[in-house]
Amino acid sequence: MGGTDEIPANSEFSAAEVLGKYLRRPSLFLPLLGLTTLVLYSGSLFFDFVWDDWPQIVNNPIVRSWSNLPRAFGSDLWYHMARHQVYYRPLFVAWSMLNYALFDLQPWGWHFAALLAHVATVAAVFWLARRLGLEYWTAALAALSFALHPIHIEPVVWISAASDTMVTMFVALAFVAFLNGRDPLRTNKTAWRSLSLLLLACALLTKEMAVTFAALVAIYAWMRPLHGRNSQRRAVGAILEAIPYGLVTIAYMLLRKHALVHATGQFDPSHGVIDVIRTLPLVVSVYLQKLLVPVGLTGLYYTPYVTGAIFRQLVVPALVLGMVVAGLWYWNRQEGDSTIAFAGLWMLVGLAPALYLRNFGNGDFVRDRYVYLPSIGFAILLAMGCRRLPSIKGWSAQAVQASAVVLLCMAYVTASLAQQVYWASDLLVWRRGQALYPGNPYAEVGLSAEYSERGAHDRAIALAQKAVREHPEYAYGPLALAESYIRAGRFDEGRVWLQKIDPAYVKSEIGMATFAGLYGRMGDFDKALALCSEILTKEPNLYSALYNCGNIHFMNHQFGDAERLLSRAVELAPEQAAPKHFLGRALLEDGRNEEGQPYLRQAAALDSKVWDYHYWLGVSFEESGNMPQARAEYQQALKLNQDSTEAKIKLTALEGK
């Protein structure tokens, strides 16, 4: 691989020449790279929904109907859960609606859609690199490294992180359109500029990471001015070119503010600016480390605020970052190529929204998905560096560069395949995080909940106790311990820990709904229903509260109240199976089987994989005298849950009828 676009005429590399001749065509190179990427991540098609996929996708009524699209533009991503969230991503919700229409709740389809988004972004990176002035093979190498880099595992194989993939695709395309719009050789510059603004709007409506786009435009315009090179004219020109993008960003922020009228402020007000400044070098250095050596990847890094070990956690990272900046400055000055400086600034500016640490919980500052957009700059620098590798005795520069690329690809593919599996299930996600960062209370609490749901109560309690003991300041520790005790049937201990939970959490919508559910599980219906009354007084149309409180009334045999709340939940989310199922059961238990059976039918049709939906539909059929249908539903329930004693008993009883 040489430093020009031409294929070297060297008979020793005849095979490489033939291959290079064909790959020199983007129409062949990009599909081949896309296919390679699909194969690399094909294992994710067998992964389940994990982590935030459950509330954002599986249990989100909004994504189940296109009629909810206007609501997506007027509310936050978690509107159905609470009213004080800060995630405004309507285009991601629209993408989720499309996936639901195409794949229902089949995880493979959602994973395939997320993988296609990554492949599309890879193509956008190639196009961007070319428009930035990189020659063909350097741009191809940038796209290749971006496609295969293991740090992209999280946004590719975790469905909920596809918003990062999508926003990056839109940003890259918007910048390409911006570059085309300022190209003096093009005649349709106005159309390109308009397209650039439209693509920026799409990026902003996908995820907040695009808010720095105007800054990238200004930086590029200053580095490569259209008119004049004196500092004042360059600055004015850069500002003028960035103004339209700034106006689009301001319009987005106003729209976001209107939609998130109930959003709360900063997440962690207990740490000030000094804490943030001391911690930033460590956070940025961790990102740089993972880009350079992508091992030990997880969705649950733990980098708490720097309060001690100043030399190791502040001075050393700051010195390392200083050396990196100095190295890039020297490289840029030696070659006189502003692309080097711009790629470095792309990394920093692209990461900037994720560096406002007070938006996150203590220690939750590093996430691989946040570096997906900034890593375009890294891929460009890596490609430029590889293309400048010199000859070594006995090896031409082309041979050295080709060997380096092969070794890099082998390392990336190996590291990626070895670490993708940790996103296959919730249990693997939490176990990986807790194994790599055993001091992370968030990972301990999450793994505790996972163990508890699987019936490993002793393990769950031990992990929750560890989190409470080692991190008494962590607000969710007592809640996790209380839930673990309650799930284990140790209600007295559960009640003790419920009293130790942060009062601020208890007063929130999610907190009240959680407490109501836990009290209902223990049979403390008076306390549970009092909380239900309080939350529904504040938010009478909150789906999660209507559904949870309707179930509590059902468990307390208050079927009339259960019918009232669950009917409202069904009205708000007609595509959800669960509220219809429990509404049908409430009517069945209340002696109104004829009214309840249609709801039970609809629930089993909407979500045919839930065994007890079929079981209770069978009970309804049996009560109405339809024995063949009852038998069929009991058999389906037993097929889905072979350990169902209830279904076995019902089938045995029907044999004599």
Language-model features and meaning:
Residues 453, 487, 521, 555-556, ...:
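Register position in tetratricopeptide repeats
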Residues 2-492, 497, 507-510, 514, ...:
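Polytopic membrane enzymes that build or remodel cell-surface glycoconjugates and lipids
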Residues 435, 468-469, 500-503, 534-537, ...:
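Conserved structural position within tetratricopeptide repeats
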